[in-house]
Amino acid sequence: MIFNRPFSKALIIFSLMLATVNFAACKKSEANNDQLLPEVNPGDDFYTYANAEWLKSLEGSEPQEWQGFLYDIARANSAKVQVVMEAMPEYKALKQAGANREKNLEASVLLVEEIASSLLAGATTKEEAYIAIGKAIRLGIPSIATLHTARCLEDNTLGFYFMLPYPKEEESVSGVHSTTATDYHVASKRLSRYVQDTRSGKTTVDYILEGIGLDAKYYLYDDITTDFVAELEQIDTKEILKNIGDAVLAELLCYCSDDYARQYTEGEVNSVEEYISRSLQYDLGYYISYYFSQAYPTDSAEPAFCALGDELIASFRKRLENNQWLSPATQQAAIEKLDHMGKHYGTPKRWPAADLPQLKGELLVADVLDLRQSRYNTIKSLLGKSADEYFPIFYIFYSPDGPIFTYTANAFYDAAYNAFYVLPAYMLEPAYTTAMDECQLYATWGMTIGHEITHGFDQRGATYDKNGDKNNWWTEGDAAKFAELNALRIANISSHEILPGVQAYGEQTVVEDVADLGGFNIAYDYWVNKLKERGIKGDELKEMKRAFFLHFATMYSEKLSDNDMLARAASDVHSAGHIRINGVVQHIDDWYELFDITETDALYLAPEDRITIW
């Protein structure tokens, strides 16, 4: 199923999924030391030391599935999503139409041909070809472009943009060369309000917008749009029209039969069911998100998360005030950015006033088109609305690298919005319960939120200002020092091994590794200060500090085959679980005292080699 996606390719999303059933039993915040095997030295491998009992229980068994907190919560959440989907009338209609696809093949193909023909009917000029491109975008033909929402920085309202396809060899299906990955739309230059030039008449963009049918005053553009239009204007009209027709046929015929699906995907998929599963996020994701929020509200958990977020923001602010390597100017800019950071938790409180589609369950391609028309209507209803008011709904329709649905088990920070969001699944059982031990809460959810906050100040986040605008707020000297600290973190993580003899990819994971270290420091600082304010000291304080480290270490317990471990490491922006733990604790001074770490231990770092960035 497409819903069980524990890792995301972009937006620097923190994939922490907590399974309370696996946490060490806790009484008065003292970790159960029975799980710690004496033959495992914490200074050599703290991850294994803290997770020894769980790992020992899996010895001798090759996992049938990836195991551990991250994967346990993903599976639990996928089960919830499946229950929601099975009850959805839209999903039932799609299943019914899919089952009847062979019987309705002739009618389905005829419908597709009619749509392609009507889209291009009478088009002979360049201007009419541009309008046809807009109509194809409205229709939802991803090989041409897809329609998305985004926040306009000028007034914090929602606009729309069309996102070009990923580069594929030399050309996209539309015939226009795509020179960069789609996240350039948001990550490299900000999207700006489009202003029509009434003096020079209609432009290429104006004709495309006419075909899309949305008010041009809400359109947002960037350099990629300019490049797209410049290349488009060099292509012959007949070639544009042919490519549009081919793209429409290739997309829609895949819903008509297994043979068409294989033919038009060049064997990448083998059946309509497989094709539907690949496109289900785009077509049905909004409706799953809506029904999921109705079935699994997070009202009871939100007060605890709101309080926790405020505490972690305060903790990081104090750390910024005490920062020793930033100049006063950059330090103040960082504090201002933190003070402006948005905090969002749980189930969306307001949904756009758009009608849900009434699918017939007859022709699959007709139902898919109805879903896409409904998606278009929902985007239209969001335009001009406050981004804050409809956060995080617009993320379902805004995505450089795939939509973020509110049923996903995840949390993320968005640099272009300067806000973080803990999605509902993290606030539901088994990820969170109101009975969760306080130490466990800070070591897990505190670290999670601290991690997301730190993303505002990592290599990418640091290039955006307090308003989410791409703007340099660093002095030259501070930027150089920051680069130096990141290089040290890269070297540190690269010294760890994914598997024996296989070094970690520190440069690939540095953004998440910096956030892991910052998140731990923020949460641990707050926890220790909270204990001291309560008058806890001596051995009791030491035991509660130890418990924090042990709870933290259980967050990333995982059991994967060696092949899966290597395959994941090759593309994942997060380090392997044992590296995320060992690569953090070795930089924390208290860890050395709490667990009697000495210079002879493998994880030992001299005080001057311990890294503190945030």
Model-predicted segments: where are they?
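Bacterial N-terminal signal peptides that target proteins for export
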Residues: 2-12
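Bacterial N-terminal signal peptides
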Residues: 11-22
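Bacterial Sec-dependent N-terminal signal peptides
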Residues: 23-31
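His/Glu-rich zincin catalytic helix
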Residues: 32-34, 39-72, 176, 181, ...
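Active-site-surrounding "flap" and adjacent substrate/cofactor-binding loops of secreted or lumenal enzymes
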Residues: 41-44, 49-112
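Short coil/turn segments at secondary-structure boundaries
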Residues: 57-62, 94-95, 127-133, 145-153, ...
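Noncatalytic, helix-rich "gating/capping" subdomain that lines the substrate-entry/channel surface
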Residues: 80-312
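Intrinsically disordered, low-complexity linker/terminal regions across diverse proteins
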Residues: 289, 293-614
